[in-house]
Amino acid sequence: MKYPELFTPISIGKVQMKNRFAMAPMGPLGLADAQGGFNQRGIDYYTERAKGGTGLIITGVTFSDCTVEMQSMPNCPNSTYNPVHFVRTGREMTERIHAYGSKIFLQMSGGFGRVTIPTNLGEFPPVAPSPIPPRWLDKTCRALTVDEIHAIVESFGKGAYNAKRAGFDGVEIHAVHEGYLIDQFAISFFNHRTDEYGGSLENRLRFAREIVEEIKKTCGADFPVALRFSPKSMIKDWREGALPGEEFAEKGRDMEEGLEAAKLLISYGYDALDVDVGSYDSWWWSHPPMYQKKGLYRKYAKAIKEVVDVPVLCAGRMDDSDMAVEAVQTGVCDIVSLGRPLLADPDYVNKLRAGKTADIRPCIGCQEGCMGRIQKYSMINCAVNPQCARERAFAYNPVFRKKKVVIVGGGIAGCETARVLAIRGHEPVIYEASDRLGGALYEAGVPSFKDDDRALIAWYAHTLEKLGVEIHFNHRLTAGELKTLSFDTLIVATGAKAKTFSLGDDRRVITAKDALAQSGENVGKHAVVIGGGMVGCELALWLTKDLGKKVTIVEALPKLLAVNAPICSANSEMLERLVPFYGTDVRCRTTAVKATENGLVIRDLDTGAEESIPADTVILAVGFTPDRELYNAMQECDEVYAIGDCKEFHNVHSAVWDAFEVANHI
């Protein structure tokens, strides 16, 4: 075993885990039924991660209160809404999870308060400790009364008791973290109260103290109660967070207060601290995109571990196995929490234990299948794993007649199609025009912050080789040649072509793909990127941060990232701030007029004024057009499908999901 330290037991209170891996809690939208119980998708979703070897499953957020922070119906499981139903559905899940030797904690929330996503509110106003601005709305929150606080505390006791009856091994309180309701009470920036719940740190933590005391009173002193805890908020101001490496005055909880709070919370009776960093006002810390470094919470977890004597859990892009074992060995944490990596691959832990790290499907940090879908009031899923939270409904369909399927294009959509077809028992054959797999994602993976894109390509290459999929490289199939081949089904995954236009003197004009394909060697010291969408912004960030270029973005719309394929807010808000932070000159409401020998002439769309800016290289990042030529030429085929960017230029999530859907029903 390569990582034995990660497979030793550890206890939270008197509950022993079989290894050092926990499933980090993630919003369980779509996993509850109308009575507040776990639906079949939720039961299958958590059980699959236990089957995959995870020692402790921590559910996503559930509620116990259903009267104070009112919502139109339970959008997440609720342990008091219909107690008998909750116990029945919960017990079905806990019994299945225990069959795999895993433990399970129910994460219980005190409420969202000012950070409630508007689609969850319905007609009800957000609540908070004080009349403060909400995260998303231009309104003022309603301050909770003391009686309402007491009612929420009492509901925790009842809800935890129902969880214990349902077979849960413990609970985790949500949370003195990320700026949720209990955290809003704990942070003076949000809490302006003058009663016993405001003022001193002890008073601001009173809500959290009363919750653990109520649960211990109701469920017994030995019933474990963990706490999700952010020792630092990373808040610059209302709705404005700090970037990595940025100097700023912390308006939320700073580390000094975080360490003091940790000691107090343990003295109140909490049995473990599940550490992260950030808040909804700095969402890219709480839900780190690919622009954040791996293991970004480690130094904060280590600081907490040095002042408490209970187990410390640490999440935050901990899907580097060597980093994880080092964290346990060096006292950074006791337990490694994996959230999105377990969405991407529920068998992560078992594969790691068996030394099959190349088999682990990587999370790419896009957050479009998980946080992005939750924000849109959909359900938690995964961009690279279409079966996530749909394990039963999207199981591989059996094959009754083996088919030979020709796949034109070895990009991500083509690879996913071949993978699913081969697993089901069909005979896929890939024809790829270049000498490698990955399609456009290969160039997209050039920047240092997109390493996981390349990791996904490597995983597909490894997986297709194991499955014995036939691949023809450097073979550009034409319609004429296709008509001479024998096959049952044709899949066209020929991608998309970059849009271009002439700027007059085009000698120094290239596309974003050209720049990435040559690792920036064809880009001069001064570069102008035309287009402020995700491609243009990531290109500018790479050119400045990684290559030290001087970059200007020219964007016709009023802001960066105004038109894109869907992007999770944590990703888009961080990227929008990183671009100028690393020195890019952003020119919105501006258009390119012409390229000259000395640079690029641009025009202000509001004033009409023109100016010339330095440009050794002009890079077009103005979108893509699906390449449907081959698909259109093959319409006489009995069974032909267009997938990926060939169908519609979108993102990895759409490419993988469309490919899975088509391949699973051939």
Task: Give the residues covered by each predicted segment.
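Feature captures the FAD/FMN-dependent oxidoreductase FAD-binding
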Residues: 458-497, 593-599
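Rossmann-like dinucleotide-binding cores of NAD(P)H-dependent redox enzymes
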Residues: 427-467, 540-592
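Rossmann-like dinucleotide/flavin-binding elements
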Residues: 399, 403-431, 472-484, 493-566, ...
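Flexible, Lys/Arg-rich cytosolic regulatory linkers and terminal tails that connect or flank
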Residues: 370-386, 565, 582, 650-653, ...
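Active-site acidic short loop of glycosyltransferases
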Residues: 221-222, 309-310, 487, 524, ...
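Flavin-dependent oxidoreductase catalytic cores
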Residues: 1-408, 412, 416-428, 436, ...
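Receiver (REC) domain switch-region micro-motif
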Residues: 57, 273, 336, 490, ...
